Amino acid sequence: MRQRTIVCPLIQNDGCYLLCKMADNRGVFPGQWALSGGGVEPGERIEEALRREIREELGEQLILSDITPWTFRDDIRIKTYADGRQEEIYMIYLIFDCVSANRDICINDEFQDYAWVKPEELALYDLNVATRHTLALKGLL
């Protein structure tokens, strides 16, 4: 089984949290709402990976004014690729508290939508199990 270290930002701006809706046909949680993030590449430092993933998935215009390591966790997930292949992966999640200075987002094709959500409205979204766990641990659900 392949192992991946995943950097995952919990991004907050003006009291709201950023959720991204995964594409329907791929990823670990197709069609569900999630936090952004992705894998650390060989030789890459953790914060470099976090900033790269944010640029790739959310665009160059989003400005983070604060990044603080928060927690970690692990689990085993099935990843679905765009061609329909599936793979079981041992995932190690490194989760960061992030504050953005703006809300200027340009999502890539991994996502179909995004939303800035008030804490009291987070439970109304079809959150994947990993995001639900993270938000509950943070006291937001």
Curated annotation (Swiss-Prot):
Cofactor requirements of the protein: Mg(2+)
Cited Gene3D superfamilies: Nucleoside Triphosphate Pyrophosphohydrolase
Domain Nudix hydrolase: residue ranges: 1-141
Domain of life: Bacteria
Motif position, Nudix box: 38-59
GO molecular function, one term: magnesium ion binding
Pfam families with a match to the protein in the record: NUDIX
InterPro entries membership: Nucleoside_triphosphatase_NudI (IPR023781), Nudix_hydrolase (IPR020476), NUDIX_hydrolase-like_dom_sf (IPR015797), NUDIX_hydrolase_CS (IPR020084), NUDIX_hydrolase_dom (IPR000086)
Keywords on record: Hydrolase, Magnesium
Enzyme Commission numbers on file: 3.6.1.9, 3.6.1.12, 3.6.1.-, 3.6.1.23
Subunit structure: Monomer.
UniProt function note: Catalyzes the hydrolysis of nucleoside triphosphates, with a preference for pyrimidine deoxynucleoside triphosphates (dUTP, dTTP and dCTP).
The name this protein goes by in its record: Nucleoside triphosphatase NudI
